[in-house]
């Protein structure tokens, strides 16, 4: 970062807030059968036999009695920011649930880590996809980003965030500086 900054170059990192690798320590802890602080960091069903067809789940490969939601590939478990519409109350949580809020705080910590190292901001992958079961203007996902933007404005006012959203009128209102 220092060499780039010496040359007047700003560095934006690619932030992927919707999922992690299945090798991430958060996920390794989350897949344990015993409840722990990471149990709800990802979205899990309550039984290995439950996998509603409207979602993409990986089934029966962990010690936990449940299946985990993915955004794309089996190696990319989806982080749990909650569900705007609860259709399966035994395992879906609202965005206001403390465990979903803990996911937001963890993502802020990831951002702080890189900003403290010298990054100048982030290009955010799939920024509109955090809260599940949400259509239209995505008000719950917008709340998440406004919360993150508040932290950035207070702690890193020079940091830039650019969304991959493809709806500038929504993403700018959610706190992004630009959208593509």
What are these regions (language model features)?
Residues 132-140:
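Short, flexible/disordered intra-domain loops and linkers
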Residues 21-129, 143-180:
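Alpha-amylase-like alpha-glycosidases and glucanotransferases acting on alpha-linked glucans and related
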Residues 1-16, 114, 119-121:
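Conserved beta-strand->loop/alpha-helix structural units within folded catalytic cores of enzymes
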